[in-house]
Amino acid sequence: MKNLQPQEAYAWLQAHPDALFVDVRMEIESLYVGRPPGVINVPWYEYPDLQPDAVKFADIVAQEATGKDQPLLLMCRSGQRTLAAGKALEAAGFTDVQHVVHGFEGELDDHFKRSTVSGWRFEGLPWEQM
């Protein structure tokens, strides 16, 4: 799995129009916090269980993808869930997996707020909100 900084990920998407851009956050996070245009939501885990099912996740991504060699870009809140999700996809046979380091919102700052230090939104990249 390749690690891409948000600006690199955006440029990578522009260079790979055939890529599948997957938001692995819970659907409610994606809708209310915001998400990049064109991303599809396939949660790594969902409320109330909050327990990932790697096989189910990989199966859903496989249904959305054109094949296991399709380029994939994964995004979550801060770049942690995508590490586990990406490993699960590689274990399931996906061969071209990237993830956005720092995710959509990035790390917490000294005041426990996100999107102020790093992340897709902090970098001023395109996003939308419900």
Model-based region annotation:
Residues 1-19, 27-71, 82-130:
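Rhodanese-like catalytic fold shared by cysteine-dependent sulfurtransferases
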Residues 75:
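Short, surface-exposed ligand- or partner-binding patches at beta-edge/loop junctions that are enriched
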Residues 23, 79:
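Conserved G/P- and acidic residue-centered "switch" motifs that form tight phosphate/ATP-binding loops
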